[in-house]
Design a protein with these regions (language model features):
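A beta-strand edge to alpha-helix "cap/lid" segment located at domain peripheries
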Residues: 2-37, 42-174, 179-263
Length: 263
C-alpha cells in the first residue's frame, strides 16, 4: 500500500511537471486550445498589473500574439496536498526590446473529475509594474461557495490580513498547512518556517487591508483572490494583489499556498 501511494504521488508530480511545461509553451505560442482543455471552469488569473480575469478573459488575452520570446521556467517546484497540486516557479524571457526579463508564478491545479485541471494562476514580473489594472476585476462565474463555506473562508481571509498587520505568528501557526509556501513580492518563495519568521517581524507598511475579495470553492479546495491597499513607509498609497489556496481536511481549512504581488 505504501509503495502504491509513493508511485501514485510520483506519477502526479510528473503529470504536473508536464502540465507546467505545456502551460508555458501554450502561453508563448498563444495556444488557446491547450488552455481550453486544461483550465477548470472556475479558473481565474491574477496578472502583473493587478488585474483579475476569469477563464473567458484569460483565453481572450492568450489568443493575442505574445510580444515576448524565449519564455522558460526556472527552478520549478511542485508539491501536492490532498487534491491540490501547486506549481511555484520563476521564469525568464526576452522582452520585445530584446532585453532580458524575469518573473515568477504560482499555478494551482485541482484533481477534478479524474484529472488535474488548473484552477488558479498568479503571474508576476520583476521588477513589479505599477498596479494600473487593480480596478479591473472579474466576478465569480463558477465555483461560487455555499453560505457556510463562504463565511468560513471570508473570516479566515480577514484574519489572515489582520495577522500580517499585527505580526500574529500564533494565528498563522494554527492555520497554515505543514506544506505551506508563500510566493513573495520580490520573486522568492518562503516555506512555512521562513514565512513565520518573517511574520514575527513588525510589518513595514501601515493600514494594510483587503479589498475586492473573490472566494471560490471546488469540493475541498478554497480559492481566494483579493487586492490589498496600504500606506508605504514614505506615506504614499500602495496596492497589491494576492491569491491564497486553502485545503479542507477533517473539517478544517488550512492554507497551503499564498502568492503576493505589490506595485
Amino acid at each position: 500500500m505504501g509503495n502504491a501511494v509513493v508511485k501514485g504521488r510520483a506519477s502526479d508530480v510528473q503529470t504536473l511537471e508536464q502540465l507546467n511545461r505545456g502551460y508555458v509553451h501554450a502561453g508563448q505560442t498563444s495556444d488557446t486550445g491547450w488552455f481550453d482543455k486544461h483550465l477548470a471552469a472556475c479558473f481565474m488569473a491574477s496578472n502583473p498589473d493587478g488585474s483579475l480575469v476569469d477563464r473567458a478573459g484569460f483565453l481572450e488575452r492568450i489568443g493575442r500574439p505574445n510580444p515576448s520570446k524565449n519564455m522558460a521556467p526556472v527552478d520549478t517546484r511542485v508539491r501536492i496536498v490532498g487534491d491540490i497540486g501547486v506549481v511555484d516557479s520563476g521564469f525568464q524571457y526576452t522582452k520585445p526590446d530584446n532585453q532580458d526579463g524575469a518573473g515568477h508564478y504560482t499555478d494551482v491545479y485541482g484533481f477534478i473529475e479524474g484529472r488535474w485541471q488548473c484552477v488558479s494562476a498568479h503571474f508576476a514580473l520583476r521588477p513589479a509594474p505599477p498596479q494600473t489594472g487593480g480596478a479591473k476585476t472579474a466576478d465569480v462565474v463558477s465555483g461560487a461557495p455555499n453560505a457556510v463555506d463562504h463565511a468560513a473562508l471570508w473570516d479566515l481571509n480577514h484574519h489572515y490580513i489582520r495577522a500580517v498587520r499585527e505580526s500574529d505568528v500564533c494565528w498563522f501557526d494554527s492555520n497554515l498547512a505543514a506544506e505551506f509556501v508563500n510566493g513573495n513580492a520580490d520573486g522568492t518563495f518562503s516555506d512555512r518556517a521562513a514565512f513565520l519568521a518573517f511574520i514575527a517581524k513588525p510589518i513595514a507598511v501601515s493600514n494594510l487591508r483587503e479589498e475586492d475579495v473573490r472566494i471560490q470553492v471546488v469540493r475541498d479546495i478554497g480559492i481566494i483572490h483579493a487586492r490589498t491597499a496600504y500606506t508605504k513607509p514614505d506615506g504614499q498609497a500602495g496596492a497589491g494583489r494576492y491569491t491564497d489556496i486553502w485545503w479542507r481536511a477533517a473539517g478544517q481549512w488550512r492554507c497551503v499556498s499564498a502568492h503576493v504581488t505589490r506595485g
